[in-house]
UniProtKB/Swiss-Prot annotation:
Species this chain originates from: Legionella pneumophila subsp. pneumophila (strain Philadelphia 1 / ATCC 33152 / DSM 7513)
One Gene Ontology cellular component annotation held by this UniProt entry: pathogen-containing vacuole membrane
Annotated protein name in UniProt: Effector protein MavE
UniProtKB keywords: Host membrane, Membrane, Secreted, Transmembrane, Transmembrane helix, Virulence
Compartments (UniProt record): Secreted; Host vacuole, Host pathogen-containing vacuole, Host pathogen-containing vacuole membrane
Effect of P78A: Results in attenuation of L.pneumophila in both hMDMs and amoeba. Vacuoles cannot be remodeled by the ER and are fused to the lysosomes, leading to bacterial degradation
Membrane topology label: Single-pass membrane protein
Residue span of motif NPxY eukaryotic motif: 77-80
TM spans (from-to): 184-204
Subunit composition and interactions: Homotrimer.
């Protein structure tokens, strides 16, 4: 499951959705999130992807690396910006759109790469989870963002969405004791706990 495949997937779907129903005038956009039906695998995939997204957007070096990986140096190429999914994309600067797009692609790639030699069934599940994240959650992640600090708003939206996804996943798990270890169902996140802890110190600091 290579990063190249991931980039092809993201750029190939850039025109597939209209974000009008997630505009700033919509009341409580998280209502749509609660109505999205998904499997436990897909929910787990999203939780891990959002954790990576928050970390990448919180650490300058990781964001720079994400931009480099995603664009392969082609910083001005508009096909690398998933504008059709970003809420009120016309109001975003090119720089913010590029940063967000690179970060979300890197996050999905990092989670996808954890599945070594996936079966055809797993590949389909990964593809489905990616579709849900890009089609349904990117508009939510980018809704009601501060024009002066888009990425901070995205991180805050991501944190809220992730908490709701975790709460929903807990409801689906028959044995609550499994959650005594908060990372037991999210093994990919566990590998980034140290990085996330560092990122937390700058999450609401001077980071753009």
């Amino acid at each position: 499951m290579t990063r190249f495949i991931m980039l092809s997937f993201v750029t190939g779907y850039r025109k597939s959705i209209s974000c009008n129903r997630f505009s700033r005038n919509v009341v409580s956009p998280y209502f749509f999130m609660r109505t999205i039906i998904m499997t436990r695998f897909e929910r787990n995939f999203l939780i891990n992807s959002l954790m990576f997204l928050e970390t990448i957007l919180s650490v300058d070096k990781k964001l720079d690396d994400a931009i480099h990986h995603f664009t392969q140096g082609q910083y001005e190429n508009p096909r690398y910006q998933i504008n059709s999914r970003i809420t009120n994309a016309d109001d975003w600067s090119k720089e913010d759109k590029l940063k967000f797009t690179s970060a979300i692609a890197e996050a999905i790639a990092l989670v996808s790469e954890k599945y070594e030699n996936p079966t055809s069934e797993t590949t389909e599940q990964i593809q489905s989870a990616r579709n849900i994240l890009l089609d349904n959650y990117v508009p939510l992640l980018t809704a009601n963002t501060d024009p002066e600090n888009r990425l901070k708003s995205v991180r805050e939206n991501s944190s809220q969405i992730r908490k709701e996804l975790i709460a929903k996943l807990k409801d689906e798990v028959p044995y609550k004791s499994q959650f005594e270890n908060p990372y037991v169902l999210f093994p990919f996140v566990a590998a980034t706990v140290a990085v996330a802890a560092t990122a937390a110190s700058v999450l609401f600091g001077n980071k753009p």
